[in-house]
C-alpha cells in the first residue's frame, strides 16, 4: 500500500546513525548486507506510529526483508513504485542504486519520487538513456529521432526493383525490421538470426525467402554505415552497441522495472552485472512481443515475490481482470491469477476511451466529434498526429488521395509510387505493414469526409498543458501503459472469447501462435486494469455468468467490428435524424422505444451520461431511438446539471 503523506521518513540519515545495528558486513566477502528486522525495530523505536502510517502489506514487507537477486510479479495498481522506493530506502545509505524505467515519462516521474524521499543515491535511467551516455558522446554519431522511412532506406542503399513491382520498397521495409530485430537481440552477428521465423503472412514469407541473400547483405550494409557514422543512427543501434561492449556498471543494486517487456539486449547487460538485481513487472502485461521484447520474469531463476493487492480498483474490477486472464486456458495451461482489489476511489474526473489499435481509436473519436455536441475538449495520449501517420511517414491524406486518384497531391514517395489502392494493399500484404493497412480501412470507410472529420478532431484537441480540460481522453493500450483513469470505455477491437474460440478452432489452418494470442488477452487485461472506478465495455467482453456490478457497465447489443463498418457505410450523414413514421418499424429496430422510463432506468442513464458514454452507445444499450435518448436527457436536465 502507498505510505500516507504524513508518514515519518526513515531516511538515509537515520540509517546512517544506526548503521551498526541495521547493516552487517560479511567477513569473508566484505559485502554489506541489510538486516531488515533490526531496521524495523529501530524504526519502530524512533517512531511509535511507524507501523500504522506506513501501512506496508505483508508482501511488501517480505520484499524489503529479501537478500540477493529477486523478481517481483506485481499486478496492476499494486504500488510497485512505492515498494521499490521503500526497498531502495532500506538499503545501505552509501549503496549506489540504478533504477531502469520503461520510458522517458516514467523515468521523469520516478526521478521526482526518489528525490522527494531523499534518495539521492538512486540514479534513474531508461535503457536507451543509459546506453546513449556510454556510446554516443565523442564518436561523431548523429541520431535519427524518428528512424528511417522505407523510401529513405531504399534511396540510401540505392535499391532497385529488379523488374518486380515495388520490390525496392518491400525489401527496404524488411531491412528496417531486420535491423530492429538484430539491435534488440543478444546476437553478435546478423547472420545468426532467423528473420524468416518472425514473418507470418504467406506473401511476405515468400518474398523474404526469394530475396534472403539480398536482405542479409543490405541489412549488414545499413548497420555498417550507421556504425561508421556515414548516416544517422537509430535509437536501437546505440543500445545494441552498448550491449556488444559488455559494460561493467558501477552500481551495488539495479532495479529493472517493467521486466515483462524487456529488450533482450538490455536484459543481457543487466544480468551480467555484479550488482544485486531486482526485476519487477507483471507477466500478464507483456504487450511488446511485436517489438521483440521478452518476459524476463520467466527467464531468470531469482527468488520470486508477489504483489497481489491492487490499490487502484475495487474487488469487482479485480474479478473482471482475473476472468479476462482465464481466457488463456482456451489454448494453454493457465494458472488462475488472484488479485485482491482494495481500491476505494469514488472520484469521476478523468474519462478515457481505450482501443487496441489506432483504427479502433479513430473510429471512436470520429463518433464523438460527429455525434456528441457536449464534447468540447478532447485529448489524445501521445502526439495526435501519430494517429494519422504511419511510422513510415505516410499520412491518411496520402492514402485518401490515392483512393481518389489525385496522385499529384500525394507527398509520400512510397504511396506516390503506387498505381492504385490494389497495389498498395498488395504491398501491405508483402510487408505486414499493419499501420498502412489501418489507414486503408479508414479511407474505405469514410472517404471524402476524412478532411472535415480530422479538422473537427484537431479543433477539439487540447495540448499537453491543458490535458485537465479534456472531457474525454483517447488512447491505445500501448500508449496508456502505467496510467490510470477514473472511468474508461473500451472500443470493440479487442479479442473476445468468441473470437478466441474461432481462432483456436482445430479446423482453422492459420491458427496464430500461442504467444500472439497471449498478448491479445494481455491487451484486454491491461485495458481493464486502467480503470479506478468504473468500466463501460461491449457485452462480448464480459465473461459468461459475471455478476452485476455498479462499477461495470455492459453496453448491450454493441456492434461487432464488421457490423460497425457496414452500419457506418450505410450512414451517409452523421447528423441525419431517424425518420420513424411507422411505429412498428421503429419498435423492430429499437425494442424498448416506447416503453416508459422508470426511476431505475433514469438513474442508469444519468450514470452513463455523466461518465461520457456516447449517444450512439446509449441507443444500443437502452434499445431506444436517438430522439428518445436525447429527449430523456433533456427531460432530466442532465446537460444543465452535469456539463
Give the location of each predicted region.
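Conserved helicase NTPase motor core
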Residues: 48, 56-65, 69-72, 211-294, ...
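Short alpha-helical "recognition helix" segments of helix-turn-helix
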Residues: 617-620
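Conserved helicase/translocase motor-coupling segment
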Residues: 347-473, 477
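Conserved P-loop NTPase-based nucleic-acid remodeling module centered on helicase motor cores
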Residues: 105-181, 372, 378-389
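ATP-hydrolysis module of ASCE/P-loop NTPase motor domains
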Residues: 140-222, 407-428
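C-terminal accessory regions
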Residues: 440, 444-475, 481-487, 492-569
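P-loop NTPase Walker
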Residues: 27-140, 322, 529
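Conserved helicase motor core of SF1/SF2 NTP-dependent helicases
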Residues: 72-78, 94, 102-105, 130, ...
Amino acid at each position: 500500500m502507498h505510505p500516507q503523506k504524513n508518514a515519518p521518513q526513515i531516511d538515509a540519515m537515520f540509517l546512517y546513525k544506526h548503521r551498526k545495528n541495521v547493516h552487517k558486513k560479511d567477513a569473508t566477502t566484505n559485502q554489506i548486507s541489510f538486516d531488515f528486522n533490526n531496521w524495523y525495530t529501530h524504526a519502530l523505536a524512533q517512531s511509535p506510529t511507524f507501523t500504522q502510517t506506513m501501512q506496508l502489506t505483508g508482501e511488501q514487507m517480505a520484499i524489503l526483508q529479501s537478500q540477493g537477486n529477486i523478481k517481483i510479479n506485481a499486478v496492476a495498481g499494486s504500488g510497485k513504485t512505492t515498494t521499490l522506493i521503500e526497498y531502495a530506502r532500506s538499503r545501505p545509505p552509501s549503496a549506489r542504486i540504478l533504477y531502469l524505467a520503461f520510458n522517458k515519462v516514467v523515468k521523469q516521474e520516478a526521478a521526482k519520487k526518489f528525490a522527494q524521499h531523499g534518495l539521492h543515491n538512486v540514479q534513474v535511467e531508461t535503457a536507451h538513456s543509459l546506453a546513449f551516455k556510454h556510446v554516443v558522446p565523442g564518436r561523431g554519431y548523429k541520431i535519427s529521432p524518428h528512424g528511417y522511412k522505407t523510401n529513405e532506406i531504399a534511396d540510401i542503399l540505392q535499391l532497385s526493383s529488379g523488374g518486380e513491382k515495388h520490390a525496392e520498397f518491400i525489401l527496404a521495409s524488411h531491412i528496417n525490421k531486420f535491423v530492429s530485430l538484430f539491435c534488440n537481440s543478444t546476437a553478435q552477428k546478423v547472420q545468426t538470426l532467423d528473420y524468416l521465423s518472425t514473418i507470418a503472412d504467406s506473401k511476405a514469407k515468400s518474398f523474404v525467402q526469394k530475396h534472403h541473400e539480398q536482405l542479409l547483405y543490405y541489412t549488414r550494409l545499413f548497420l555498417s554505415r550507421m556504425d561508421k557514422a556515414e548516416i544517422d543512427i537509430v535509437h536501437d543501434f546505440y543500445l545494441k552497441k552498448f550491449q556488444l561492449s559488455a559494460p561493467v556498471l558501477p552500481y551495488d543494486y539495479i532495479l529493472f522495472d517493467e521486466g515483462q517487456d524487456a529488450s533482450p539486449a538490455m536484459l543481457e547487460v543487466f544480468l551480467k552485472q555484479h550488482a544485486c538485481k531486482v526485476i519487477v513487472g507483471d507477466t500478464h502485461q507483456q504487450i511488446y512481443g511485436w517489438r521483440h521484447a521478452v518476459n524476463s520474469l520467466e527467464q531468470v531463476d531469482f527468488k520470486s515475490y508477489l504483489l497481489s493487492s491492487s490499490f487502484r480498483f475495487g474487488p469487482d474490477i479485480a474479478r473482471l481482470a482475473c476472468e479476462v486472464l482465464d481466457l488463456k486456458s482456451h489454448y494453454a495451461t493457465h494458472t488462475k491469477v488472484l488479485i485482491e482489489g482494495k481500491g476505494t476511489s469514488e472520484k469521476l474526473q478523468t474519462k478515457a476511451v481505450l482501443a487496441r489499435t489506432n483504427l479502433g481509436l479513430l473510429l471512436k473519436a470520429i463518433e464523438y466529434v460527429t455525434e456528441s455536441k457536449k464534447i468540447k475538449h478532447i485529448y489524445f495520449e501521445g502526439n495526435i498526429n501519430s494517429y494519422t501517420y504511419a511510422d513510415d511517414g505516410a499520412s491518411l491524406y496520402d492514402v485518401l488521395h490515392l483512393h481518389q486518384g489525385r496522385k499529384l497531391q500525394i507527398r509520400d514517395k512510397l504511396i506516390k509510387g503506387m498505381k492504385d489502392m490494389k497495389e498498395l494493399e498488395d504491398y501491405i500484404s508483402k510487408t505486414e505493414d499493419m499501420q498502412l493497412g489501418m489507414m486503408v480501412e479508414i479511407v474505405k470507410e469514410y472517404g471524402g469526409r476524412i478532411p472535415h472529420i480530422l479538422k473537427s478532431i484537431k479543433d477539439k484537441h487540447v495540448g499537453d498543458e491543458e490535458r485537465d480540460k479534456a472531457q474525454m481522453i483517447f488512447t491505445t493500450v500501448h500508449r496508456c501503459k502505467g496510467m490510470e483513469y477514473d472511468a474508461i470505455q473500451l472500443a470493440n477491437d479487442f479479442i473476445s472469447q468468441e473470437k478466441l474460440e474461432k481462432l483456436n478452432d482445430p479446423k482453422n489452418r492459420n491458427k496464430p501462435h500461442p504467444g500472439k494470442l497471449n498478448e491479445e488477452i494481455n491487451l484486454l487485461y491491461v485495458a481493464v486494469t486502467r480503470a479506478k472506478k468504473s468500466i463501460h465495455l461491449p457485452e462480448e467482453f464480459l465473461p459468461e455468468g459475471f455478476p452485476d456490478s455498479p462499477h461495470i457497465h455492459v453496453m448491450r447489443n454493441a456492434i461487432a467490428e464488421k457490423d460497425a463498418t457496414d452500419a457506418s457505410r450505410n450512414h451517409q450523414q452523421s447528423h441525419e435524424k431517424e425518420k420513424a413514421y411507422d411505429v412498428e418499424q421503429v419498435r423492430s429496430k429499437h425494442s424498448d422505444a416506447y416503453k416508459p422510463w422508470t426511476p431505475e432506468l433514469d438513474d442508469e442513464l444519468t450514470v452513463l451520461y455523466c461518465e461520457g458514454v456516447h449517444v450512439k452507445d446509449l441507443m444500443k444499450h437502452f434499445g431506444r431511438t436517438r430522439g428518445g435518448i436525447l429527449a430523456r436527457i433533456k427531460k432530466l436536465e442532465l446537460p444543465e446539471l452535469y456539463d
